[in-house]
Amino acid sequence: MMNKLYFYCLALFVAPTFSAFGQTQPSQDENGYYLIESAEHLKWFRDQVNASEHEQVDTNGDGQINMDDDTVVRLNAKLTADIDLGGESWTPIGEYNNGEEPDEVRFGGYFDGQGHVIKGLNVQPIDGRQSYGLFGYVAW
């Protein structure tokens, strides 16, 4: 019995520290928008977009969905606070690699800054990457 109690107490004190070291998923509003309130939330959102295998869209205009088309990720977010990225190197939301592997991913959702500021953005060249900025590749 004492071991169980010790385990539960330990879990209560240790569990909150894990989220401080990793990215945490932001909550969503009633419309499904992710509510970004920290740098960790923004990084999580970026990683969801860039790692997604969402719908493929006719991005080359030939009227068909085929291997020449890009993946378009339709996730939506709202900033709920000013974000400070602290000057660490930033990987853009959406990837354009000039047709090279890995496959290109376009951000095709809504990103509502709601008047908030993102500062401390540090964009560095990434080998094989052809796009830079907060957003690297967006769908029109």
Walk through the language-model features, giving the residues of each.
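Bacterial N-terminal signal peptides that target proteins for export
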Residues: 1-9
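Bacterial N-terminal signal peptides
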Residues: 8-17
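Surface-exposed repetitive/solenoidal architectures
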Residues: 21-140
